[in-house]
Amino acid sequence: MQKKLDESNRPRFHFTPEKNWMNDPNGLVFHKGEYHLFYQHNPLGNKWGHMSWGHAVSTDLLNWEHLDVAITEGADGAIFSGSAVSNGDEITAIYTRHTEANQSQCIATSKDNGRTFTKYEGNPVLDLAMADFRDPKVFRYADYWIMAVVKPHQHVCSFYRSTDLIKWEFLSEFGPTAAVGGVWECPDLFPLSYKGEEFWVLLISINPGAINNGTGTQYFIGDFDGVSFTPKYSTTDPRWLDFGRDNYAGVTFNNEPNGRRIFIGWMSNWQGAVLHPETSWTNAMTIPRILGLTKMGDEIVITQQPICEPTYEIVIDATKKHPSGLTGFVELGYNPVSKKIFINDYETDVEPINQQVHLKVIIDRTSVELYTDDGTRWITMAVFSEPKVTRELTNFG
């Protein structure tokens, strides 16, 4: 008799696979009226393996329709992370083909809005004969395509260009710099504006070696001229997209119709994903976040605002002598001594405004996302406990 698995921990409005294992978001693209979310997926079980691309679509980024596996592992190798572009009437996926000895970049094309894909017969389209060379992010720039792809152990992001997605010309490299305590993965490069001035943002995920001693995503603000990325500020100290432990491998949507830069991350980490409770599904994505820029002191920094309303809004008196916030199945709030916001043991600096700290919280059964009102500080944490434990929080302090 098949064991019935408890579904009470499944998030209500964060994306989860219909069943089996999921990790990195892949191929985020808007095409013909639908947001496409592809993702690293094991169609055969709840643990990592048999990597293929799962697939779901949405019109609002909150309600998702599960579709069949888009690109499956084959005799020639597993289907690792990558991206997708809207290319006329077609969707072209650009992904890493993985074998024990080699990682190379390949493409597959869909003529039916992502429902089926055909692998290019001439694959791979980019092969350096390296064991670790992966995670291509491709986007349109001027009249050609740009690819950002990493050499993980060298802590280098390489840039290539192409006019047809098949023949690729090497342009430049960025790195090593900033956080290099683990492998570099899942790059993304995109423009954002602040008060009419355009900047370019480069995202690099790292595992391990992030601020929380696990996985995380660092970002760089700078300029991209179609050939090379030049950081605007010193890269000695890394800048972190999230100060929690559970936001990794995040990338943004190509071809977003409203001009927004929308980010989704894997709401887990490689240290804790194996501890996921026994359910029919494994792992979730962060809430989609709209990225922007603001100025803190003399520097431009990233802001993130969720596409949904928060569960809680908290205004904390920063003049109190003791920490205050919300407590229950987790404890979160603000510590006036250290001037940090926190979820359990994860924290980050926050400067009060008019002696107040404005916090917002998104709770969805097994996850907590805490962020400042201006969106400059986020802490994301997956939390698993007994299903009957309340998800309510009460004030303390």
What is each model feature region?
Residues 1, 195, 221-397:
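Beta-rich accessory regions
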Residues 1-26, 45-48, 62-86, 114-140, ...:
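Surface loop/turn signatures of beta-propeller and other carbohydrate-active proteins
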Residues 31, 87, 139-141, 190-192, ...:
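Structural WD40 beta-propeller signal
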Residues 34-37, 89-94, 144-147, 196-202, ...:
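Entry beta-strands of beta-propeller and related beta-repeat scaffolds
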Residues 42-46, 98-101, 152-155, 207-210, ...:
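Short glycine/acidic-enriched loop and turn motifs that connect beta-strands
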Residues 52-60, 105-113, 159-165, 215-227, ...:
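Beta-propeller blade signature
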Residues 73-77, 100, 116, 146, ...:
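Accessory beta-strand-rich segments of carbohydrate-active enzymes
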Residues 81, 90-124:
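Carboxylate/His-rich catalytic cores and anion/metal-binding grooves
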